[in-house]
Each structure stands twice: as structure tokens, then as C-alpha cells.
Amino acid sequence: MLKTLVTDVDGTITDRRRRINTAAVETIRTLVDAGIEVVLASGNTVCFMDGLCKMVGTDGTIIGENGGVYRRGFSGTLRIPGDQEVCREAFKVLNDYFAGKGVELELYSAQYRFADVAFARNIDPDEARAIIRDHGLPVRVLDTGFAIHLQTPGVSKGTALVELAREMGLSPSEMMAVGDSENDIEMLEAAGIGVAVRNAPVRTLSAADWVSEEGYGDGFVEAVKKYYPYLFSR
């Protein structure tokens, strides 16, 4: 039996223009009102996630910065498995390299991040990976489709899901995860049921146990409708 739903935000409970899908929000509220814990998981910052949790109506249990941080409830201890120092070092290397080519890297929410470094998608992530590799830095370059993130290897939404499940007294097999991007793959694989919405890339679709017919927030609603009667029973 599934007891908790973990969902990505951008591209999963939004529309293609990153506007929140109101049907997805109503679905989340229905789950919360039924006593099912809903965890929001994103590459975004803790402060962004806190505001979203308040407005949507969840209890503040989050996975942020692509697994670099996670927390049980608004009053819980913020866990930070990511190592931001090495990510900052990697960003400096990239910034110096691309500045030499006349390209400026625009940081995203740097003052609000605890574990990773995020910046605009105006460079080729494969080129960034090659530069990081040439400098021997232990940093993962992650392209979420919304930003490029520099992250500690071995840290992902999937590892955060496993650790969060332990704090909640659950097994990862008792969690359902929904996502749309390559940064959701580990999360879908770690959960008992992993669902990809139709707009996901091929690698993410292949990692999922089930794929919705609809994309974006409508696909999220479809997924919950499919699994709710059978798996979220009490």
C-alpha cells in the first residue's frame, strides 16, 4: 500500500508555461484532506518551496535543490547532504572559462541555496561537463530543462526520497513519485511506483512504471486518479 505521494513541481503540476495547474492543486488538497502526505520535490530553493507548500496546503515536507536539501514538515530539521563548496568552486571554473568566450553565466537564487549552484541555460551542459571533468572536480552537471545545476555526485531526488522515507518511518516502496524531467529519474526508480507525465523525455519515460496519457498537470491528475482507489486505501 502506498502512503505518501512525492511530486515534482515544474512540468508536473504546472502547465507548459510554468503556470500552476489548478486541477493538480485541487488533487493534492484532496489527498491531504484524506490524510495522505504529499511531498513537493524540486530543484528550487527552500524559501520558494515553503511558499508553495503554504499556498497549496501541504505540511511543508519538501525535497529541494534536486535532493541537495530535504525536510520533514515546516518545523523539521533541514537536512543538507549536498556539498555546496565544491559546487561553487566548479562554478568559478565554468564562469572563468565561458567569460573568456564572451558568455556570462547568470546565477539563480544564489543567496537562498544551501547545497547546489544553479544558473541559466545559456551554455551547452555537455561542454560544461567536459570542463568539470578536465579539472577533476567531483561535481555533477544537471540540466533540468529550467536551469543548469551543479550538484554533489550521489545526491539526487531519489537519495533524498530514501532518507526522507526513513525519517517518516516508511519504506520507499510505500511512496509514489511523479515527475517529468531527467532529474526525476532517480526519484521514480527509488519509489514503489514511479510515474512520468507524458511530456517527459524518453529517458524519464523509460524509467517510469507507468506513463500518463496527458502531459503536465493534467497528467499528474490522471496518475492520482489511476492509483488512488487501489493503492491509497486505508
UniProtKB/Swiss-Prot annotation:
Reactions listed under catalytic activity: 2-phosphoglycolate + H2O = glycolate + phosphate
Enzyme class: hydrolase
Positions of Mg(2+) binding: D8, D10, D180, D184
Pfam families recorded: Hydrolase_3
InterPro entries: HAD-like_sf, HAD-SF_hydro_IIB, HAD_sf, PGPase
A Gene Ontology cellular-component term: cytosol
Co-factor requirement: Mg(2+)
Residue sites binding substrate per the record: K157
Active site: D8 (nucleophile)
UniProt KW keywords: Carbohydrate metabolism, Hydrolase, Magnesium, Metal-binding
Family listed: Belongs to the archaeal SPP-like hydrolase family.
Function: Catalyzes the dephosphorylation of 2-phosphoglycolate.
PANTHER family attached to this UniProt entry: HAD SUPERFAMILY HYDROLASE-LIKE, TYPE 3 (PTHR10000:SF8), PHOSPHOSERINE PHOSPHATASE (PTHR10000)
Family matches, as NCBIfam families: HAD-SF-IIB, Pglycolate_arch, PRK01158.1, SPP-subfamily
Protein name according to UniProt: Phosphoglycolate phosphatase
